[in-house]
Amino acid sequence: MINSTKGYIDQNGLAAKQFVQTKQLSVIRLTFMVAAFGIFFIFLVALTVQQLLSRSTLIDLASDFRTLSTIAVITSFVSLILYFVTAFKLRNPNTSLTWFWALIITDVISYGITLGILLTLATTFSKQVNFEANDIVYAFLGASLVFGSVWGLSALPSQKRRYQQTQTLFHILLWAFVISIVASLLSFILNFTVFASTTNLLDRIIPGLSLIVGGIFSLISVYFVSLQIRNEQDLIKYYESEDYEMARRQSWRSALFFGAWLISSFMNLVYFILRIILITKNFSRV
């Protein structure tokens, strides 16, 4: 019995060691894998919302918009609370992954509902609001181009470093923070200066999500950057002490937390680009 238990522990430890050491499941790839799946499920939620709204009558549609927008804003604030909670729990080795999965799920629900409403407007009321599905596609392509460029540029200086996966991840998250806070600040400035007299589609549908939540998220991202530095030190400590099981758990906690951060940063940038597209179209229409 003792030998079988010891064999199980050795086998489990070997699996954990292989998990950490393999290049295909490094921290940075794990983080981007989480973010990619999160964005994929955002699209699934958005398409589901679009299908539900497409079955509503014109009379019920306005009420459905308000209800779904309220749910989106509430879940976005719940997501912010979970960011704070999981940030404090990230470095605790006994923290359950449930907290981090909850963070991902609330992000997916919030951004998925918002995107579903926008898809409905773009497909059903495109002429009335001067808004098309192509605008959403261009916004996603623009955000993907920015984040892809940041990923490529961030990977260049870290090729010769010993722990390049965590160093590269830190650079990407740092730039994600810069992109997010600049987009939120520009949105805030434009709303109260140049475009104070114009009504924007995103402001009518989700004012809290486009400004308040984006601004708060950008501010707490300052703390996330410093948190990543300490988290990187924890991972290096586990690697050097050959505590591979703990390193694996910490890698998953890190991937889920910072993957959620990448999802939020990416979607904030998408909405900002979409905002600029709509403003440009409104000006050209005038």
UniProtKB/Swiss-Prot annotation:
The keyword Membrane applies. It is a multi-pass membrane protein. GO terms for cellular component: plasma membrane. Keywords: Cell membrane, Membrane, Transmembrane, Transmembrane helix. It is found in: Cell membrane. It comes from the Bacteria. The chain crosses the membrane at residues 30-50, 68-88, 99-119, 136-156, 169-189, 205-225, 254-274. Its main location: membrane. This is Uncharacterized protein MG320.
